[in-house]
Amino acid sequence: MPTDERLAVDLLARTEYGRVAASLRAMPFLACARHIVADGRLLLRMHRGHGYHRACVGHVVAYGSDNLNRARPGCAEGRWSVEIVGKCAAVEPTAAELELFGPAPRSVDGGAPFDPVYLRVTPQFVTVDRQGAT
């Protein structure tokens, strides 16, 4: 695994949520997703009811996460952001992966039941941006 990929995996493990970017009917969109990294694979959990997963599966997507709103000035890790670009596929997570995700939200958008869908992003490009790390 290349150095940037290892660093990206380490940094992503420090956060729980990020944003997936894809195209829906030729229009770009961003959607929030819960993520885990298991065996070097990026797995996402999204709400099926929004339908965003249909635009992701079988296509190249970008997924990003960061600590920009949590990093304090002078902290040793500094500010960082990670972006992974790769092919997306629908998956059924293992019991161990489901445990890593933790409990799903009960509802979304003011009361609709959360219906999870799971996606895997196979990295083709990884970008790590670090600022102020010591």
Could you describe each region identified by the protein language model?
Residues 21-23, 45, 64, 122, ...:
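Beta-strand residues in well-ordered beta-sheet regions across diverse protein folds
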Residues 36-71:
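A short mixed-secondary-structure module that forms the rim of ligand-binding clefts
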Residues 15, 30, 37-39, 56-60, ...:
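Short connector loops at helix/strand junctions that flank enzyme active sites
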Residues 15-47:
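Short beta-strand segments
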Residues 66-134:
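Charged, gly/pro-rich active-site loop segments
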Residues 3-5, 46, 102:
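Charged, amphipathic alpha-helical segments
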Residues 1-19:
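Short, basic/aromatic recognition patches
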